[in-house]
A protein has these predicted regions:
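A ubiquitous, low-specificity "background" feature that marks scattered single residues
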Residues: 3, 8, 37, 42, ...
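Intrinsically disordered, low-complexity regions enriched in Ser/Pro/Gly/Gln/His and often acidic
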Residues: 1-4, 55, 170
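Non-catalytic pre-domain segments flanking phosphatase-related domains
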Residues: 1-28, 176-186
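Mg2+-dependent phosphoryl-transfer enzymes with acidic/Ser/Thr/Gly-rich catalytic loops
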Residues: 45-49, 86-87, 91-93, 100-186
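Alpha-helical substrate-recognition element adjacent to the catalytic core
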Residues: 11, 16-101
């Protein structure tokens, strides 16, 4: 039995360090990226999700370094709104069944080009954004069809530190990681 692997584009072969240093906007899907993709539906009809604290802390580090963060999600939930507010993410677009128009609108609002963005996704509806962003990322447990278009596939699964992995790498390539770590070495 043979296993066909999707063509992988590695960080350093897909983009130079200089290209990665141009990334200013980190755009995230929610279900399957910031969460493990599971949704708990309570008897009163409300939903809850589990978010990674590790991802949340790295998002705050990204913002502290001057980076912008946005969310583009296919679903609209109160849990996403609340978590985005907790993390200081004001660029939140929910209920986007077609994500590419939301991506283009977001770029107009912030005055950036696709090359200045990184997008992290996990499923089929993320393919257009992974292809369009300057740096397209698929989480470890993403759909195989998405992985074939990604510049990088994380080692960690969605909701389990995948976003933290991406942020750490970007900050290291932007030469900002060590500076941010100084506050923890006191």
């Amino acid at each position: 039995m043979y296993r066909i692997l999707w063509p992988l584009k590695l960080w350093d072969s897909a983009m130079t360090d200089n290209d990665l240093s141009k990334i200013q906007l980190l755009i995230l899907d929610v279900d399957g990226v910031l969460t493990d993709g599971g949704i708990v539906v309570h008897s009163d009809g409300t939903e809850s999700k589990r978010f990674s604290v590790l991802d949340g802390h790295r998002i705050k580090l990204w913002q502290r370094s001057g980076g912008l963060t946005a969310v583009i999600s296919g679903r609209e939930t109160a849990a996403t709104t609340i978590r985005a507010k907790q993390l200081g993410i004001s660029l939140v677009m929910q209920g986007c069944l077609e994500k590419l128009p939301a991506f283009e609108q977001l770029l107009k609002e912030v005055g950036l080009t696709p090359e200045q963005t990184a997008y992290v996704g996990d499923d089929l509806m993320d393919i257009p954004l992974v292809r369009r962003a300057g740096f397209g990322v698929a989480v470890a447990n993403a759909a195989d069809e998405l992985k074939q278009y990604a510049d990088f596939i994380t080692e960690r699964k969605g909701g389990e530190g995948a976003v933290a992995e991406v942020v750490e790498h970007l900050l290291k390539k932007k030469m900002k990681w060590e500076e941010l770590m100084e506050r923890y070495r006191v």
